[in-house]
């Protein structure tokens, strides 16, 4: 169970300030299904909206884990990332996790060039090297730390490349 939660955390909860938005120009949405033991337990959707140099990515996800007929973990979230060119300028989310309300309100401070974060687990500043933990952006794999899109907390990470695989859809 711990391994499942850890993998789910890495998959669901891991956007660097320079997001290479051009890599995502052809996408209007990304839809992911979440499975556990071969059973569909939820979804994770990203919607891309563009207006000139501004891009807004909306994220919605919901899943629950049941064990012996009892729900042991449940989460539902809505988030919005806003970019001007490749620069993340804001991120806001609201989450209900096991009946507890969580949130993140992040803004780029133009004077300090750092993120001002007000979250349910963290209030303070973060450098723009941090990544919002959402999986549409491949930069999550290169970042040394991430900002939780659920609570705003900052988590150090080490990602080790172990191989390359082509997946045909």
Map each language-model feature to its residues.
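Short hydrophobic interaction/assembly module
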Residues: 76-86
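Sec-dependent N-terminal signal peptides
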Residues: 4-13
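N-terminal cleavable signal peptides for secretion/export
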Residues: 17-78, 91-100, 152-169
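Short, low-complexity Ser/Thr-rich regulatory SLiMs
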Residues: 47-52, 83-85, 108
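Hydrophobic residues embedded in beta-strands of well-ordered beta-sheets
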Residues: 53-56, 88-89, 112-116
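Solvent-exposed helix/loop surface patches that form functional interfaces
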Residues: 25-27, 92-169
């Amino acid at each position: 169970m711990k391994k499942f939660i850890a993998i789910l955390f890495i998959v669901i909860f891991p956007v660097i300030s320079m997001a290479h938005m051009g890599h995502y120009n052809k996408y209007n949405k990304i839809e992911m299904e979440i499975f556990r033991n071969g059973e569909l337990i939820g979804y994770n959707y990203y919607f891309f909206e563009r207006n000139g140099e501004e891009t807004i990515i909306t994220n919605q996800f919901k899943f629950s884990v049941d064990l012996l007929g009892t729900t042991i973990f449940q989460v539902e979230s809505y988030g919005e990332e806003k970019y001007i060119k490749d620069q993340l300028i804001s991120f806001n989310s609201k989450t209900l996790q096991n009946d507890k309300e969580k949130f993140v309100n992040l803004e780029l401070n133009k004077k300090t060039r750092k993120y001002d974060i007000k979250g349910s687990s963290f209030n303070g500043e973060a450098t723009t090297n941090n990544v919002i933990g959402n999986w549409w952006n491949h930069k999550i794999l290169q970042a040394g730390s991430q900002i939780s899109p659920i609570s705003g907390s900052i988590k150090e990470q080490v990602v080790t490349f172990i191989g390359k695989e082509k997946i045909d859809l």
